UniProtKB/Swiss-Prot annotation:
One of its GO terms (molecular function) is ATP binding. InterPro entries: AAA+_ATPase (IPR003593), AAA_lid_4 (IPR041445), DNA_helicase_Holl-junc_RuvB (IPR004605), P-loop_NTPase (IPR027417), RuvB-like_N (IPR008824), RuvB_C (IPR008823), WH-like_DNA-bd_sf (IPR036388), WH_DNA-bd_sf (IPR036390). Mg(2+) binds at residue 64. The lineage of its organism: Bacteria, Pseudomonadati, Chlamydiota, Chlamydiia, Chlamydiales. ATP binds at residues 18-19, 60, 63-65, 126-128, 169, 179, 216. The keyword Kinase does not apply. This is Holliday junction branch migration complex subunit RuvB.
Amino acid sequence: MTHQVSVLHQDKKFDISLRPKGLREFCGQKQLTERLELFLHAAVQRGEVPGHCLFFGPPGLGKTSLAHIVAHTVGKGLVVASGPQLVKPSDLLGLLTSLQEGDVFFIDEIHRMGKVAEEYLYSAMEDYKIDITIDSGPGARSVSVDLAPFSLVGATTRSGMLSEPLRARFSFTGRMSYYSDEDLTTILKRSSNLLGIDADTAALYEIARRSRGTPRLANNLLRWVRDFAQMREGNCINSDVAEKALAMLLIDDWGLNEIDIKLLTTIIDYYQGGPVGIKTLSVAVGEDIKTLEDVYEPFLILKGLLKKTSRGRMVTQIAYNHLKRCSDNLQSLGEEK
């Protein structure tokens, strides 16, 4: 148990050490970051607290990093909360009253807030006021309490699940997209410099193009390649070493992993290529529906390997071609041996 806690602590330190401190260090999402820089600096120049910000998109693209950057840019504190933990007004009360003027209040997975807590947040966002109920029973009375002006930053992987009243209270909204291989390579160069990893550009590009357009995954794979090189290759990290390390994780040259392949082959082998419903697919693959929808499907759809129809999921011809190529490659490797 102690070892597990230690590993988790190391993972957290690893993530924090690589987090960009400002927008100039944040690679990718150029249109979004240009708008955000203008939005924040204009407010700072006027001596005002910036308006509330909402960032949405797939997991691992840097929404939490942007929340930290907002706080760093305005030079104030950051208070962090998670949507699922905010169910009732009392869950918000202590957090909101502890905020100092200009602080950033970051709510991750904001779409998972309880409805009652969400409605309690409306007046805090709009008027910097909340109502507190004093006493109970017939003598109960409501008192309005002023809050210090603050900026709320919300992050969500499912913007469609946000209510319209909540969404309308955000002055700035930014959709985060998957990163290009080139941007990920730049991110990995920065990460390798910070971590003291000696890897050539070709190796970093091999990692980048297998990272599903996601910086968090790219940095995790960089760490794995570092460990592999340390134990098997005398700390040498070139493209060949990167390929070997990633092959050990069963990640192909498109970034598809074991679950991706299983999902596609299940549809092909058992459901004639589809369509098949998401509930049936979840049982067949052994992954919960939310994980399939949030983690695996977006990338497969982006790559043109999977399509969603009104009748269910279907595999595309591109998927058939890719899986055949992977099979041929494995066969040729076996013949070489």
